[in-house]
C-alpha cells in the first residue's frame, strides 16, 4: 500500500496519522485532496458505527483505502451523554464553549467522585475488497467543575486527569499525545496494521 486517505479535513488529525505512516512509506492524504468525497450523515448509535459509515462511504467513492475516526465524550452521570453527539451537544454549529457550558450545567451539584467520564475513539479502516477493521480506545478521567487550561480543543478544558493533577487542556502537546484516546487507538492500529492490510478485519 502506497497511499491512504484520512476521512477528515482537520489538519491536526492528518499530522497524527502522517507520523504513524511515514515509517511505513505510506503517503497520507485527506479529504481536502478529494473535493468530490461524500459528506456522510453520522447516523450510527456508536462511535464505531459512525467511523465505519464514514470510512466505507469514502472508500467506495474514492476507490482507495480510507481511515475514518469518530470520537467523543462519555459521562457516566449523564447516562453516557454527550456520546456520539459530543461535537454538536449544544446545537448544530460545533461550538466548544457552548458544549462545555451545557455539560457543566447538567452536572451542577454532582460531586466530583460521581463525575467519571472517558474520551472514546474508534478508528475504521476500509480497504476495497477487504473486511472493514475497527480499533477502539479510551482515556479515563473526571469532569472538572470549571474549565482550566488553554491547550487542546473540544472538552479538553474540563476533562480532569487525577493522576496528573491537570485537565487535558493543561497538558503539553507531547504529553497529551502519549495518553489521549486517539493516541491509544493509533497505537492499536499500528500494532494490528499487518493483520488489517492482510484482510483479517476485526473489531475491538
Curated annotation (Swiss-Prot):
Instruction: State the GO CC annotations.
Output: cytosol
Task: Give the catalysed reaction(s), semicolon-separated.
Answer: XTP + H2O = XMP + diphosphate + H(+); dITP + H2O = dIMP + diphosphate + H(+); ITP + H2O = IMP + diphosphate + H(+)
| SUPFAM superfamilies listed in its UniProt record | ITPase-like
Q: How does it assemble?
A: Homodimer.
What superkingdom heads the lineage? Bacteria
Pfam families found in the cross-reference section:
Ham1p_like (PF01725)
- EC assignment: the record states 3.6.1.66
Binding residue positions for substrate: 8-13, 71, 153-156, 176, 181-182
One GO biological process this protein is involved in is:
nucleotide metabolic process
Instruction: Output the PANTHER family linked to this UniProt entry.
Output: INOSINE TRIPHOSPHATE PYROPHOSPHATASE, INOSINE TRIPHOSPHATE PYROPHOSPHATASE/HAM1 PROTEIN
Regarding protein family, the annotation reads: Belongs to the HAM1 NTPase family.
Q: Which residues form the active site?
A: 70 (proton acceptor)
- Keywords of the record: Hydrolase, Magnesium, Metal-binding, Nucleotide metabolism, Nucleotide-binding
Q: What is this protein called?
A: dITP/XTP pyrophosphatase
Organism of origin: Geobacillus kaustophilus (strain HTA426)
Per UniProt, what is one GO molecular function of this protein?
Answer: XTP diphosphatase activity
* InterPro entries cross-referenced by the UniProt entry: dITP/XTP_pyrophosphatase, ITPase-like_fam, RdgB/HAM1
Enzyme class, top EC level, equals: hydrolase
Function statement: Pyrophosphatase that catalyzes the hydrolysis of nucleoside triphosphates to their monophosphate derivatives, with a high preference for the non-canonical purine nucleotides XTP (xanthosine triphosphate), dITP (deoxyinosine triphosphate) and ITP. Seems to function as a house-cleaning enzyme that removes non-canonical purine nucleotides from the nucleotide pool, thus preventing their incorporation into DNA/RNA and avoiding chromosomal lesions.
What residues bind Mg(2+), as annotated?
70
State the organism's lineage.
Answer: Bacteria, Bacillati, Bacillota, Bacilli, Bacillales
Q: Which cofactor does it need?
A: Mg(2+)
The record describes how the cofactor is bound as: Binds 1 Mg(2+) ion per subunit.
CDD domains recorded: HAM1
Q: Does the keyword Flavoprotein apply?
A: no
